[in-house]
Amino acid sequence: MSNDSFFNNDWLELQRKYWDSWSEMGRKAMGLENQQTLTTPWEGALDHWWKAMSPATPDFSKTFMEKMMEQGKNFFRMAETFANTPEDTTATNGLTWWTKALEDMQKQFSGSLDDGGNSMQRMMSFWELPIDNWQRMMSSMSPMPGDMLRNMPHEQLKDRSGRALSAPGLGYTREEQSQYHQLTRTAMDYQAALQEYTGFYSQLGMKSVERMGDFIQGVIDSGKSIDSARTLYDNWISCCETVYAAEVATPEYAQIHGRLVNAQMALKRRMAIMVDENLGAMNMPTRSELRTLQDRLQETRRDNKQLHRALHALEKQVAALSGKTPTTALKAPAPATKATEKPATRATTRRKTAAKPTGGTADD
């Protein structure tokens, strides 16, 4: 009889492979098979801490904390990258190593390295917030959930759909087909403007790397040294902020941002028209009808105020003709009040008349 228990090492190894296979299948289903692995112990510890604390984090602050965690991971990743110095620590090889590290960062910004397409998202964490805010705003104003145009291949779609959009509509739904064609053209224009806007931020990343290279070259030429990873990270942040402040103030950024806003408003207007068409087909009140009703109610309020002012002016004129002030004219008793005073006088007379016989009887 074998002395091995049922839960031997082979069984545990089989269970581990089973769960690893399920985890790998889940990552592939979610598109996370090429996600970057955690290379540093501090980065792994920070990730485990956030996974334990994130379920209890409120929704309104979870996004902010995720950005902070990503900044911390970038800090540890950069510290690990620059801490792995070459074996030959001469000045020439050291400068070559620093130059190669900066060139790799530029390649990551340009997307030339095979990193699953996530290098740009990680390296753009410093400028990801404005783009993320814009995408959230666009998603909230769109009748369709999510950002449907985020991963759309613009050039391929533009080339293939150009012929289809140029074809006229057929049948009794040709007007509706024409509206959908216009909606598609507007969406493609917005996608082109969004890609131009994102490309501008990619150029910011490359210029920041160049500025960081100039800073490191200046440190090497001066004979100084960088004492800690925190100093290196602070200088990197300073380079990014300087480049951002300089480039955002240029007319080029104003034109790019203006084209993006115009394309977004045109797309929003076209979507609103399509929504009104669908609501009208279902015999439901549309947005334009509700807005027309609101305008008419506002006009009615204005007319009532004008009539009230005109009536008050007429009351003043009547009071001036009758020789009374407007206040007394408004508070003057109506003619029906005099009629009500007469019964009171009669009642007093009757009381006096009724009191006289009583007194005569007492004298008798």
UniProtKB/Swiss-Prot annotation:
Biased segments, Low complexity type: 324-338
Pathway: Biopolymer metabolism; poly-(R)-3-hydroxybutanoate biosynthesis
Region (Disordered), start-end ranges: 322-364
The keyword Cytoplasm is assigned to this record: yes
Keywords from the named record: Cytoplasm, PHB biosynthesis
InterPro entries tied to this protein: PHA_synth_III_E (IPR010123)
GO cellular component terms attached to this protein's record: cytoplasm
Compartments reported by the entry: Cytoplasm
Keyword Transport found: no
Biological processes, Gene Ontology terms: poly-hydroxybutyrate biosynthetic process
Location (main, coarse): cytoplasm
Family: Belongs to the PHA/PHB synthase family. Type III PhaE subfamily.
Function: Polymerizes D(-)-3-hydroxybutyryl-CoA to create polyhydroxybutyrate (PHB) which consists of thousands of hydroxybutyrate molecules linked end to end. This subunit has no catalytic activity but enhances the activity of PhaC, the catalytic subunit.
Quaternary structure, from the entry: Forms a heterodimer with PhaC, which may multimerize in the presence of 3-hydroxybutyryl-CoA.
Additional remark text: Poly(3-hydroxyalkanoic acids) (PHA), of which PHB is among the most common compounds, has potential uses as a renewable, biodegradable thermoplastic. PHB serves as an intracellular energy reserve material when cells grow under conditions of nutrient limitation.
Protein name per the record: Poly(3-hydroxyalkanoate) polymerase subunit PhaE
Gene source species: Thiocystis violacea
